[in-house]
Amino acid sequence: LKIGTVHQCNCCLGSKTLHPLVSVIDLSKADLSPHTDIKFGFYTILLSECKCEAYAYGHQYCDFSDGTLVCLTPGESISMKENNKEFPSKGWILAFHPDLICGTPLGLNIHNYTFFSYCPEEALHLSLREKQIILEFLERIRQELERCIDRHSKKIISKYIELLLDYCTRFYERQFITRSEVNKKVFREFNHLLDNHFNVKVSLSTDVLSDEYCANLLHLSPAYFNDLLKYEIGKEFKEYIQF
């Protein structure tokens, strides 16, 4: 299922269009086939409040279980069939078009929110308090959308989204803390990979030995892999191997 605009998203998920570029959608009211694969043409923040394995993207033993957050860039898909997942029957979607944040501080800095480049299996798993904070911002945005659109709407809504993303950054950093032992294991596997490469002298160029190449061997996205390295050792891939 390809959803190109915020209005189309509202139509597919049974929500009213209060603004053509942004929407907060209650998934409990959505009428969508459980195993539908969806490609979104805009930024999408998906909050699942379902506490079951069918929605637990990458959930590990050391993670909280009160909510799961997945962030998608325009043109990205979320696959239900491939991962044997179901579209959440309880939760929320924040959908916003790039035009909404064009010319705003958020528009200039959204590339800094690297979790938009994580894969769904690297989702953020929220505590109850963290989920409540996310829901509070979604409610603020929803209330602003209930007002008539005026010259202040874009600035206020984009600021709320920016603050929400700042909290997501904080919560992801907390997740790196609670996953400390898991991450250390990944780091050891990475060093073992480097040892094999340099000691065995496999005929690979430095172009092949990239963050993308190593992340793929570790079953991680390059963005998550680099953020994990930054948290564990304070350096990204290229700094660590000193190219």
Task: Give short role names for the model-derived ranges.
Residues 1-63:
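Generic protein-terminus/edge-of-domain signal
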Residues 83-147:
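A hydrophobic/aromatic-rich effector-binding and dimerization subdomain
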